[in-house]
């Protein structure tokens, strides 16, 4: 993808932004193709326990034996988001996404956001997340690649910042050196449409300008 885009638009810098599920895929992409990029922004990420991810992957494989890989399991879906709304119960099941209730309601009303993944999709996702626990895989990431981690300190995906810090530490342990991180007080998961989204955009812009100078 990067090679093709560079053919169409040569001579310009390339930065990758990965948010939420995309942040996990972005981290994998950086290990394989980070040498093609000038930097990356990792937003709303986390670092789930390896044993839990392995269990979820095994469960998907077992369920597929009986239902097929295209089966959409509510159980696996609920397990994947278990506990995210803890402490916010009462209004919707997804208030963990955002302090802006209107944005949460827009999300819930959009069928492109609320469909259930197939077992195959979950299996692939869990397989990818497991790669991020492999030090040899992480060591493939360019050591000096500029990285910016952004998250809300009330985002359950990143365990209120603790999972974000574990993700960063895993990269530092692999020798990746050029990492910055900012946690936004009170912010939840969807930073680009959170109540402080203007601050987030300004921080992204400032970071990009610094690395384009």
Describe every region a protein language model picked out.
Residues 1-12:
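Conserved acidic catalytic loop of the alpha/beta-hydrolase fold
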Residues 174, 178-213:
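Catalytic active-site module of serine/aspartate enzymes centered on a nucleophile-bearing elbow/loop
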Residues 118-139:
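Active-site nucleophile elbow and catalytic-triad environment of alpha/beta-hydrolase enzymes
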Residues 141-147, 177:
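Short, proline-enriched alpha-helix->beta-strand connector loops that line the catalytic pocket
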Residues 156-166:
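Conserved alpha/beta-hydrolase "acid-adjacent" motif
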Residues 26-112:
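Alpha/beta-hydrolase-fold enzymes
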Residues 149-151:
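Short beta-strand/loop motif that positions the catalytic acidic residue
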Residues 17-22, 26:
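Gly/Ala-rich beta-loop-alpha elbow adjacent to hydrolase catalytic centers
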């Amino acid at each position: 993808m990067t090679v093709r885009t560079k053919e169409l638009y040569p001579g310009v810098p390339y930065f990758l932004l990965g948010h939420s599920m995309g942040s996990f895929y972005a981290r994998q992409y950086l290990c394989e193709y980070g040498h093609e990029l000038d930097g990356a922004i990792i937003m709303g990420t986390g670092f789930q326990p390896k044993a839990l991810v392995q269990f979820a992957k095994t469960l998907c494989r077992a369920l597929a034996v009986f239902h097929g890989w295209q089966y959409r399991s509510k159980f696996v879906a609920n397990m994947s988001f278990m506990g995210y709304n803890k402490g916010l119960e009462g209004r919707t099941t997804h208030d963990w996404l955002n302090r802006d209730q209107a944005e949460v309601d827009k999300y819930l009303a959009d069928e492109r956001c609320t469909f259930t993944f197939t077992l195959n999709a979950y299996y692939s996702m869990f397989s990818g997340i497991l790669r991020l626990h492999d030090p040899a895989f992480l060591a493939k990431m360019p050591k000096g690649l500029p990285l910016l981690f952004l998250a809300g300190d009330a985002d359950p995906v990143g365990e209120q910042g603790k999972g974000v810090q574990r993700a960063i530490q895993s990269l530092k342990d692999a020798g990746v050196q050029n990492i910055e991180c900012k946690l936004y007080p009170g912010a939840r998961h969807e930073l680009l449409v959170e109540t402080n989204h203007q601050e987030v955009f300004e921080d992204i812009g400032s970071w990009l300008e610094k690395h384009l100078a």
